[in-house]
Design a protein with these regions (language model features):
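Conserved nucleotide-cofactor-binding alpha/beta core module
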Residues: 75-195
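Class I SAM-dependent transferase core
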Residues: 1-83, 91-95, 99, 112-122, ...
Length: 218
């Protein structure tokens, strides 16, 4: 039987730490959370490799190196409320739940929502929930959010989601600029002013369902 604990630590040592991730709580959450539980079948055998793994319904488990870079960029803290957009089977939601006071994962696909909910229960995570809804609208019921993570590349930044940031809030999203350029972008809000900066460049699979969403302009 595979030693997932050792594989998990190797992922942290070989993919996360060399990428200059220094957020101690994040490093601990990555080392403790059973990533293999969020995929099925033979995918468990390479879930700790540095690749994006298909979950079904055009959703992917983002590779640990990129995922950790996005979450570190958010600077999550224990008082924060987090939104995980395109949560898939709930891995990102589970990680955010260990870094924040509360985490909400939103997903359009009912089967994935069911899997995410079951896994959060199985892992005894009581400060997180997976809900079903259109991704482009975020989840206004629990807004505003201190941190928002988008688990997939978007062609542009969706206005409805950005507007759900709290004062001082941060949003991490990979923007597909075209011609192979993918920018991991941090968006910040201070009162009614918004800013953005590029964290790093890395390709991730696209998150469908945003083509008709109103676009946020800075």
């Amino acid at each position: 039987m595979p030693d997932y604990t050792a594989m998990r630590q190797n992922m942290v040592d070989g993919q996360v730490l060399p990428n200059q991730v220094k957020h101690k709580a994040l490093i601990g959450a990555l080392a403790d959370t059973p990533r293999e539980a969020f995929v099925e079948g033979d995918k468990k055998g390479y879930v700790y490799s540095d690749r994006h793994i298909e979950l079904g319904a055009e959703r992917f488990l983002i590779g640990a190196r990129v995922f950790a870079g996005l979450v570190e960029g958010l600077s999550p803290s224990a008082e924060d409320v987090a939104l995980d957009v395109g949560c898939g089977t709930g891995y990102g939601t589970a990680i955010l739940s260990k870094l924040c006071a509360m985490a909400v994962g939103i997903e359009e696909d009912s089967e994935l929502v069911g899997k995410a909910s079951a896994l959060l229960t199985e892992l005894e995570i009581d400060n997180a929930v997976a809900v079903q809804g259109p991704l482009g609208g975020g989840y206004s019921r629990e807004a505003p959010y201190n941190v928002i993570l988008v688990e997939g590349a978007l062609p542009q930044v969706p206005q409805k989601i950005v507007e759900q940031l709290a004062n001082g809030g941060r949003m991490a999203v990979v923007v597909n600029r075209g011609r192979g350029l993918y920018e991991a972008t941090l968006i910040t809000r201070v009162r009614d002013s918004f800013g953005s900066r590029v964290l790093f460049n890395s390709e991730v699979p696209s998150l469908p369902g945003f083509s008709a969403a109103p676009v946020f302009t800075f």
